[in-house]
Amino acid sequence: MTAVLIERAQADPLATVRLNRPDKRNALTLGMWRDLEQAFKQLEQEDALRCIVVRGAGGNFAAGADLSEFPALRASATQAPAYGRQMIAALIAIRDCRHPTIAAIEGLCVGGGLEIALMCDLRLGAADCRFGIPIQKVGVAMPYPELAILTQMLGRPTMLALLLEGQLHDAAWAERHGLLTRIATDLEADLSATTTRLAGGSPVSHRHHKLYTQRASEVLQALDSADVQRSYAAVETADYREGIAAFFERRTPKFPGN
């Protein structure tokens, strides 16, 4: 089963990119990050396209990273940057796509799933959707490239609330703090109306506004390569090893703090 699908009828100005691991609540694998990047690079080239919807299969957007991959793919500060670079490449491909994008959110929108949603231009959420970045429960730190992009969007107070508390928040909280554009009483009806509005607008206008609102918001100071590398160091700590072990053993982690 393909875990990232592009759904588009012939000559349809709308495409849907669907995260398709419903049995795992669309938990994200490294392969899915690669497929997401390629999907958006492919759709970027289609001149007749007017809007892209990103959504999950089976009633959830995405439940975050598939932690079962971490012992093999994110076990050291040497491995982790390669995984991180692929994540960032996919996120930037979504953010910088010239076509307007909408995240249609149901159920869980957590961790990497929330990052994907935040890269979309508009985010419509069903009333029962939930949001969070429970990374502190795994004992690892969000690498700087991801942290910079999200802090730029949400602001430091909201990012710290998400990262330090690790709670799942409801749609009303998400709307107040900018994670959602709006709550949709009827998600499918709101999505249909929104895609119609976007498709009816000028592609030139859309491209201009997407590009220059992004340029205007790029105010965070870039770190040098050594700082970026240091931001991956948490994967070599006892806290990270304990967090991963606790996940697989289905118990509450006891973090030593080093």
Question: Which residues does each PLM region occupy?
Answer:
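Terminal low-complexity tails and localization/encapsulation signals of metabolic enzymes
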Residues: 1-3, 245-258
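Conserved CoA-thioester-binding segment of acyl-CoA-metabolizing enzymes
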Residues: 1-57, 92
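Glycine- (often His-adjacent) and acidic-residue-rich active-site loop
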Residues: 48, 56-93
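Glycine-rich phosphate-binding loop at the start of an alpha helix
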Residues: 64, 84, 88, 111, ...
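CoA-thioester-processing core
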Residues: 90-96, 104, 110-163, 177, ...
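C-terminal long alpha-helix characteristic of the crotonase
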Residues: 124-129, 180-225, 232-236, 255-258
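Acidic, divalent-metal-coordinating active-site segment for phosphoryl/phosphodiester hydrolysis
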Residues: 166-173
